[in-house]
UniProtKB/Swiss-Prot annotation:
GO BP annotations listed: protoporphyrinogen IX biosynthetic process from glutamate
Gene3D superfamilies noted in UniProt: 3.20.20.210
Record-given protein name: Uroporphyrinogen decarboxylase
GO cellular component, one term: cytosol
Enzyme class, first EC level, given as a word: lyase
Binding residues annotated for substrate, in chain numbering: R27, Q28, A29, G30, R31, D77, Y153, T208, H326
Cited HAMAP family: URO_D
UniProt superkingdom: Bacteria
InterPro entries referenced in this protein's UniProt entry, alphabetically: UROD/MetE-like_sf, Uroporphyrinogen_deCO2ase_HemE, Uroporphyrinogen_deCOase
Family: Belongs to the uroporphyrinogen decarboxylase family.
Catalytic activity: uroporphyrinogen III + 4 H(+) = coproporphyrinogen III + 4 CO2
Site positions for Transition state stabilizer: D77
Key word rRNA-binding present: no
Length: 354
């Protein structure tokens, strides 16, 4: 086991004392980096990049070479799980992800089952390879989509603006949706545990579309299944706690409920005030966020001011991991991302220690 040279991220997630607020960025390995685009071109396609251990390792490490980040996140996609279930994932140019076989008929849903984790071996190989390449520099985060977010793509057959198909199923045949969600929850639990076995030192569950649901529907069709996953995860590996982060975009309404599902931290999108969020969840969980990704289009001065505001809103003490409130925009200037990272480190020290 390689000793971690920088474990600030893990300590902050567990609300242990830190010297500064750690930062990583959702989608930190991505299209805003010219070096990522070059590696992606070499791979041929996005899926080929995910499935090539060497290149997935390369793009995971790229942002760490450029910025002083406190964590790396596995380069992969949330839709690897339904792809392994046999839904036939493909990416249409300019249209995003699509599935050849959408889950819309009772007969198909009845046949849906947890995939053999061997079909996802390329992901676990990437985790092992990235850990080796990191050599203890910073922790590695593994991740998965939430059962509901995965179901959105599986039922709609791709991305959607209004989620009419899945919401029709939810209100007219909730039994079918529950079958999909339960299968997804079992699959995600096995998938994240296999990532932890391969070397992931923290895991994040992305509930990207939970925020489109009503209050009652969120609790029944999303939160219930995230809780099921959290209860089934390995929480210790290599002699350390493996923290679990739950990020629901648009989930600010449900922070109190989310704080009670057993996760170590909650991710916040940019619409929440982090100080209010801290008061609402009390001492139950750490918080991650929540810089508006669009604020990177501002000036260096405005970026610094926004960082200062978020740090001041959170206030003194540990339990805050700085991040964006959603993935970094592909048009963001890497120089502005560097200003963000360096400013967080510089301005946060006054809120720790002493």
């Amino acid at each position: 086991m390689t000793l971690l040279k920088n474990d600030t991220f893990l300590r902050a997630l567990l609300k242990q004392p830190v010297e500064y607020t750690p930062i990583w960025m959702m989608r930190q390995a991505g299209r805003y980096l010219p070096e990522y685009k070059a590696t992606r071109a070499k791979a041929g396609s996005f899926l080929d990049l995910c499935k090539n251990t060497e290149l997935a390792t390369e793009v995971t490490i790229q942002p760490l070479e450029r910025f002083d980040l406190d964590a790396a996140i596995l380069f992969s996609d949330i839709l690897t799980v339904p792809d392994a279930m046999g839904l036939g994932l493909y990416f249409a140019e300019g249209e995003g992800p699509k599935f050849k076989r959408a889950m819309q008929h009772e007969a198909d849903i009845a046949k849906l089952h947890v995939p053999d984790m061997e079909k996802l071996q390329y992901v676990f190989d990437a985790v092992t390879s990235i850990r080796k390449a990191l050599d203890g520099r910073v922790p590695l985060i593994g991740f998965s989509g939430s059962p509901f977010t995965l179901a959105c793509y599986m039922v709609e057959g791709g991305g959607s603006k209004e989620f009419r198909t899945i919401k029709t199923m939810m209100y007219s045949r909730p039994d079918l949706l529950h079958k999909i969600l339960d299968t997804n929850a079992q699959a995600v639990t096995a998938y994240l545990n296999a990532q932890i076995d391969a070397g992931a030192q923290a895991v994040q569950i992305f509930d990207t579309w939970g925020g489109v649901l009503s209050d009652a529907a969120f609790k029944e069709f999303s939160l219930k299944y995230i809780r099921q996953i959290v209860a089934g995860l390995k929480r210790e590996s290599e002699g350390r706690r493996v923290p679990v982060i739950v990020f629901a975009k648009g989930g600010g309404l449900w922070l109190e409920s989310m704080a009670q599902i057993g996760a170590d931290a909650l991710g916040l999108d940019w619409t929440c005030n982090i100080g209010e969020a801290r008061r609402r969840v009390g001492n139950q969980v750490a918080l991650q966020g929540n810089f508006d990704p669009s604020a990177l289009f501002g000036t260096p001065e405005s970026i610094r001011a926004e960082v200062a505001r978020i740090l001041a809103d959170y206030g003194h003490g540990s339990g805050h991991v700085f991040n964006l409130g959603h993935g970094i925009n592909q048009h963001a200037d890497p120089e502005h991302a560097k200003i963000l990272v360096d400013t967080v480190h510089e301005l946060s020290r006054q809120y720790h220690g002493g």
